[in-house]
Amino acid sequence: MYKKKVLNVPETPIDEDDWELKQEMVASDDGVNAIEFSRRDLTPRVKNQGRIGSCVGHSGRVVYGDTLDFDGKEPSAMWIYKKGKIHDPFPGEDYSGTTIKGACRGLIKEGCCEEKFWPYVDSEDAQMLEGAAENAAQYKIDAYYTIPKQNHDLIKKALLKETLWTSFRVHRHFYYTPKSGIVDSEKYLASENVGGHAIAMTGWKYVDGELYWEFQNSWGLLFGNLGFFYLESSLYEEILINNNGPIYIHTKLELDDEKYEDIRKRKEQEKKDRREKELKDLKRKEKIKSILRTLPWIGFGAVAIWAYFFNGVE
């Protein structure tokens, strides 16, 4: 199902002049010693990028969507993706894929419109609607910062505040991520490299005493653990590309602790309600899939049709 996903985030030299996030720029240390933390109840919902290399747009939608700037709204994945191609280091726009750095530069210079002004379809020819540029001008980030990949406490500290942005080298074993979402590091590295991919870092947990980072993917709810997966910190540090660590975006609207807590509780309830609905839908789809598999006269063809319609672009 996932082998046809486009993996085309290009590898670029690391810019040692990128600004690093400093400890004092993220206020509180409360929570960094937690065994497990996840922003999946706060982030925009899992979607499926479909057949084009728009993972930078989709992961950016999750990252920027988990800020006060877009509270109650959703950024346009297509805008982030297309503007990234304008501001990345590669000439022209007649290609699929871009870089997080290009997308960040686009967010600083041109902002990002709401999803309704450039709705997502899995086509390079998707058109923005009238008013998109004017809407985007309201949503510009101030800056972006790299967090050194070995500074686990600072990454955790940043994750307690917002989702982070990163890209990595995908190996073939990734296609077979189990429902637990936990990627086997040894099997992963033993399989071949198949391309670059951008994702949103959303949390962490410890498994048998080892730190694993949590990520939201853009391949639909059937991938991994309801669209999320976990990489051992040492594996992440080995396959990370283009930056020395995950990217933290600095937005114009900063939260005080009380306001953040109010928003967090509201978003958690909204996400809980949505997830309950998604789980019901998923169970229904699994039941349909199970029934289709028992019918020998339609076999795999029916399963393929089911996968296309029920796990396609949302």
Question: Model-derived features: where do they sit?
Answer:
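Juxtamembrane boundary at the C-terminal end of a transmembrane helix
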Residues: 306-314
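Membrane-penetrating hydrophobic segments
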Residues: 280-298
